[in-house]
Amino acid sequence: MGTVTWEGVTLSAGSASSGSSPSAPATFAFRFCLNTSTVRDEQGRSRPLRELIRIAQQAGYEAIEPWTHEIEAYLSSGGTLPELRRRLEDAGLKVADLIGFAEWIVADESRRQKGLEQAKRYMDWAAQLGCPHLAAPPVGATGGTSPRDDPRHSHPVTDLLAAAERYHALVELGKPFHVVPLVEIWGFSRTLRRLGEAFFIAAESRQSQAAILPDVYHLYKGGSDFSGLPLLAPTAIGIFHFNDYPDIPRDKITDADRVFPGDGIAPLRQILKTLKTLGYSGYLSLE
């Protein structure tokens, strides 16, 4: 197989060199990852990590993107992080990113400090698993639009410079672990709902490692179109959540309406071409 084409876009980075065998495997422009929330059971519950590893391996993914509560459950059942890393390595899988919900962005200093301690714990887990990234969504500052937030204490952050300083502190926290937090866009949130907001926070954080976590559905939900993506450097994208959405207005669509790539109306061809032109060669994570 020399190349793979999807949605009219050739996903291989280039043909084999003249000295290579014609049957040499293609070098793909992107890598492929499974966000573990994609394969929850019929009740919406997470599956055990052992099962998630098997699913990802059998489907041919290169990496998984587990949620921290799944790791918590694994540890509570008697597993250890070194053992989990061995399981992943035996399956030929990497951990591309951890999905956690630490309140790093909130204005309340006491809550933010607790959030940073929680983030530090997640970063330690990530480091032990060889994972380079931790998702940093605006949990606690969605304006009560997330079930993970207490609506009595969930206030939007409108001062993006202040948010950039809080992200600076979060990046500093990750440096001893060699784990970079990713500014994650949540389209339903009243904080960090647009591509420009995430980019502003990363750009003004005074951190050269700063990076963001875009998501096809969340960009649509939050009001961004995809014409801003060419402004990004490939190193500014830590991982890209890949999905699709049906023809539902932004103000009515919900997370539950997300569909598999190709089953909706998102301009995936445009997005893939843009990412390839940028030189992004990281993970597309199915969520």
What label would you give each PLM region?
Residues 24-46:
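Boundary/entry segment of secreted carbohydrate-active catalytic domains
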Residues 26-32, 60-62, 89-96, 128-133, ...:
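Short, well-ordered coil/turn segments that N-cap beta-strands
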Residues 40-47, 67-80, 103-107, 113, ...:
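Acidic-and-aromatic substrate-binding clefts and catalytic sites of carbohydrate-active enzymes
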Residues 75-92, 97:
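Aromatic-lined substrate-binding rim segments of carbohydrate-active enzymes
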